[in-house]
Amino acid sequence: MLTVTCASLSGGQGKTTTALFLGRSLAARGKRVLMIDADPQSSLSFYLGCELSSEQATLLEVLKKEVDVVDSLWNLDDRLALIPADDALDSAQDFLATSGMGAIVLRRRLSPLQDQFDFCVIDAPPQRSQLCMTSVGAADQLLIPAEASSKGLNSLLRTLDLVAEMSEVEAFQGQILGILPFRDRWLGRTQAKQSQKSLESMQEVAAGHPILPSILESEQFKKAIDQGVSLAALGYADLEYPFRTILEKLGC
């Protein structure tokens, strides 16, 4: 199982959008995919239609080792499963902080699933927190979505700093798959000046890491999420190009 974490240290950077469409794209290619909602806001769980019952285990119980990880899986279909989250996940912060190995806890908890799935896609929270660090620490490949704006540039810089710090102490042993510009705005065939300037700045600070094709600003993403369908099903297959590029980089 190859684990891909979507992480960026600010809200509104496209982490959940990226995780959702990447996971579905991998499953559509016939891959067995585990998705993990590591954000207490639990947007990924909501978008995937997960309605938690009192008996359903979540990522919180997995991290605390209160349940076997296989018993936490919410099977969406034959190829797609989810470890969900809810507000209670925030209480895992103290556990991870006092565990002495918070950054590698999730990596260890997932080890029994190595042969059950081809890919794991993790939606990390936007804060520089224990939950974020254990999500990054679990990654073989890291995707950094960043809005094509000054806020997105700052988020990218902060995320790269975190990765560098974790790499120095070997808490992150994976690779950066790429930086994924989000909400790249175009007016017809002309890129908005703010987007153009932001992408140029991202290129300058990327430290040699690849800048992937942008997720364009479009209401069709919200429609696809709300309807639980692909962009291609809505007639906008061209908007899936960034994800096709990611799949190619992952060997799919």
From Swiss-Prot:
One of its GO terms (molecular function) is DNA binding. Induction: Transcription is reproducibly circadian, under control of RpaA. Disruption phenotype: Loss of carboxysome (Cb) spatial organization without a change in cell morphology (Cbs are usually regularly spaced along the central axis of the cell); Cb segregation to daughter cells (equal numbers in wild-type cells) becomes random, impairing daughter cell fitness (30 degrees Celsius, 37 umol photon m(-2) sec(-1), 16 hours light, 8 hours dark). McdB still associates with Cbs, which are irregularly spaced, have much larger size variation and cluster (32 degrees Celsis, 80 umol photon m(-2) sec(-1) constant light, 2% CO(2)). It is an enzyme of class 3 (hydrolase). CDD domains: ParAB_family. The record marks 151 as: McdA subfamily signature lysine residue. It is found in: Cytoplasm; Cytoplasm, Nucleoid. ATP 1 binds at residues 11-12, 14-17, 41, 182, 216-218. Changing residue 15 to A/Q: McdA does not associate with nucleoid, no longer oscillates in the cell, Cbs aggregate and abut the nucleoid, cells elongate. Its main location: cytoplasm. The keyword Nucleotide-binding applies. It comes from the Bacteria. Changing residue 11 to V: McdA does not associate with nucleoid, no longer oscillates in the cell, Cbs aggregate and abut the nucleoid, cells elongate, McdA probably does not dimerize. Keywords: ATP-binding, Carbon dioxide fixation, Cytoplasm, DNA-binding, Hydrolase, Magnesium, Metal-binding, Nucleotide-binding. Its EC number is 3.6.4.-. InterPro entries: AAA_dom (IPR025669), DNA_Partitioning_ATPase (IPR050678), P-loop_NTPase (IPR027417). It catalyses: ATP + H2O = ADP + phosphate + H(+). The keyword Hydrolase applies. Belongs to the ParA family. McdA subfamily. Has an adenine-nucleotide sandwich dimer structure in common with ParA ATPases. Nucleotide-binding forces changes that create an ATP-binding pocket. Self-associates (probably a homodimer), interacts with McdB probably via the C-terminus of both proteins. Shows no signs of filament formation. Homodimerizes in the presence of ATP, making extra nucleotide contacts than with ADP or AMP-PNP. Each subunit binds 1 ATP molecule; Glu-147, Lys-151 and Arg-183 cross the dimer interface to contact ATP in the other subunit, while Phe-182, Arg-183 and Phe-221 stack with the adenine base in their own subunit. McdA and McdB together mediate carboxysome (Cb) spacing, size, ultrastructure and probably inheritance in the cell. Together they prevent Cb aggregation. McdA is an ATPase that forms dynamic gradients on the nucleoid in response to adapter protein McdB, which associates with carboxysomes. The interplay between McdA gradients on the nucleoid and McdB-bound carboxysomes result in the equal spacing of Cbs along the cell length. Binds nucleoid DNA in an ATP-dependent manner; neither ADP nor ATP-gamma-S support DNA binding. This is Maintenance of carboxysome distribution protein A. It comes from Synechococcus elongatus (strain ATCC 33912 / PCC 7942 / FACHB-805).
